[in-house]
Amino acid sequence: MGPFSTITVSFLFCLAFWHPDQIGANPVYNAMSNADLMDFKNLLDHLEDRMPFEDEAVPPQALSEQSDEAGAALSPLPEVPPWTGEVSPAQRDGEALGRSTWEASERSALLKSKLRALLTAPRSLRRSSCFGGRIDRIGAQSGLGCNSFRYRR
């Protein structure tokens, strides 16, 4: 390092300590005032009052009327017939014919089995979406890697 670069580094180092407010990190919670937080809370309460609860059954006609009103300002899209709740025979996979909707327990069981199959698939166990292969092995030995459970000894 030459004398000019040493002086420059020293000057920048001193400048960093001279103005800590402009260079240092500021916490996020100071950026919003209590009045702003109260406004957000009131807005959230207002939206919760306007939204129907999940337990209440909303008729499909009311939903289609709401979507028609909301979509009036958008560009015209081709009309899609509303879903009637019926499942095609190809989707039933051997279920009894004549049933128009799936029961909640059947849907949850189907979703659980698909999720379990996805999580236990060998391909998903080999992949790491966090690091490259070499960095993943280094991180696993230090206990900081994404798949550190696979490489423990």
Curated annotation (Swiss-Prot):
SMART domains: NAT_PEP. GO terms for biological process: cGMP biosynthetic process; cGMP-mediated signaling; female pregnancy; negative regulation of systemic arterial blood pressure; neuropeptide signaling pathway; receptor guanylyl cyclase signaling pathway; regulation of blood pressure; vasodilation. The precursor molecule is proteolytically cleaved by CORIN at Arg-123 to produce the atrial natriuretic peptide. Undergoes further proteolytic cleavage by unknown proteases to give rise to long-acting natriuretic peptide, vessel dilator and kaliuretic peptide. Additional processing gives rise to the auriculin and atriopeptin peptides. In the kidneys, alternative processing by an unknown protease results in the peptide urodilatin. Residues 147-151 are annotated as: Important for degradation of atrial natriuretic peptide by IDE. GO terms for molecular function: hormone activity; hormone receptor binding. One of its GO terms (cellular component) is cell projection. It comes from the Eukaryota. PANTHER family: ATRIAL NATRIURETIC FACTOR PRECURSOR, NATRIURETIC PEPTIDES A. Belongs to the natriuretic peptide family. This is Natriuretic peptides A.
